[in-house]
Structures are given as C-alpha cells and as structure tokens.
C-alpha cells in the first residue's frame, strides 16, 4: 500500500525545513525539537489530572471519573529512551483515559544518556510497584493493571512484563505495545526498506541505542532486547501495533509471533500506509483514531477478564 497521502504531505513539509535530523545534534536539542513537534495536538479534557511522586519517580495520573474505581494503564512514553516526557505524550494519555475508560498513569522516567540502562527500566518498575501498592488511594481496581507504551515505551513495557514475571512482581493483566522496539539489531528487511524518509530512521535508532546501552551492556539480554528472551511464557495478554513504513515493523511482528508461540494471547495489527509515530497523530489520521479505538477495546476486554 502506498504511503498515506496526509503523511506524505507532512513528510514533504519537513523535508523543506533545513533543520538537521535529531541524531546529528545533542540530546538536549533533540528534546527541544521533540517537544515542539508534539505541542500542537488536541488535549482532551479529563476530569482529574494530578502530578504525583511515585517513590521518587514523577508520574501524572489521569482519572476520567474520580467517583468510580477503575482499571489502570501504566504508560511509558516513547522517544528512544533519550527524548520525551509527560508533556510530549499528554494528549495520548488523556485520549486513552477517556476512551477505555481507565486511570492512566504516565511515567516520567529518567532519560539516557545521562541515565542509561537500566535506570529508565528501574524507574518504570518502581512506578508500577507504586501504582500497585497505592491502587485504593488512586481509585484503581487492584488486579486490573496493564502496562503500555509506544516505541521505546513499548520496549520498556515488554521488559517490565518480563521483569515482573521473573521477580514475582506486580500482576500485569495486559501489555499494549505500539510499534515497540524489541531488538538491538538492525538487520531486518524493514530496517533496510525504511532506513530513511519516514520520520524514524535507521541512523536515528542507532543513535538512540548508543545513548541507552553504550558499548558495555549486552544488547541481547532480555530486558534490553525482549525479542531475544529465552523464555517468553507466562506473560500477559498482548496487543501489538505496527506500521508499514517503520524500521521497527519486523521486530514488533516477530515479537508478537514468538509470544503467541509461547502460549500468550496476542492480537497484532499492522497499519499499512503508516509510519512510526502515527499513533500520536489522531488529529490528522483516521488510522490513528482507529488505533485508539482498537486499543481501548483490547484494554477493556482484558480488564473484564482480569
């Protein structure tokens, strides 16, 4: 399927701007650029939004109906572990909270390269534990807590599910993985076919990985590359979303297949004509709105059976 015409126009517009790509600048410059890119999206009203401290990790709690105890989604933002924060994904969290409906807890984990692996993962796990331990005070139904995230946030979600299983940690009833990073290698056909020209580039991913794990961390260990985990059994039901024109497409789909082979209930959808990051563009793209509706359906279904 050809590239979506709206996305083609967006990409052409960005090509006309002479600014260098993120990976040619500093992490600080990339963060500023990313905040600007995400500043204009519509932010839905949510009844109660509060910033909290989750045992030292900043989080933002979105509760669409504070008078009702609801399930929860602990959300880890994307941005290659280097960029992104509570503001860049605020519109996504608001929309998910209203659509499911559920309480959404967005996690402002520390970023690489100042805080490389495993610090972002540890922050996310700390936040998940805090949510579990404080469910009653947060208006959350204990035992109905999911994790999710986009891109690097999908990587963190998958790693958190593995870690929680390995350490007999918090029970996770679902993982929602939006075009997740699952492998620290660059040898798939989607990396070759979509190396540049579709927002996320192969060189950009190499830059992100370098800042996250450097040269001393084994890139094949499970909490870095969940696709390489030797044991993918006993993991929560999973939803995986991929995009046709995305370097990460193949590793996301391979992860979904391996999870299914290990006995996990998996629902995987590829959105043709889309690029990495399209989930954030519900203001522009019908497909992004469809993903929100599908994600809300998947989460609600898991919450009912948890």
Where does each model-flagged region fall?
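Short beta-strand/loop motif that positions the catalytic acidic residue
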Residues: 240-242
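Short amphipathic alpha-helix adjacent to the substrate-entry channel of hydrolases
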Residues: 87-106
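Alpha/beta-hydrolase active-site loop
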Residues: 115-137
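A glycine/proline-hinged amphipathic helix-loop "lid/cap" segment
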Residues: 1-62, 304-306
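Hydrolase active-site cap/lid region
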Residues: 162-217
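Short beta-strand element of the alpha/beta-hydrolase
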Residues: 69-79
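Catalytic active-site module of serine/aspartate enzymes centered on a nucleophile-bearing elbow/loop
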Residues: 284-306
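Gly/Ser-rich "nucleophile elbow"/oxyanion-hole loop immediately N-terminal to the catalytic nucleophile
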Residues: 132-147, 167
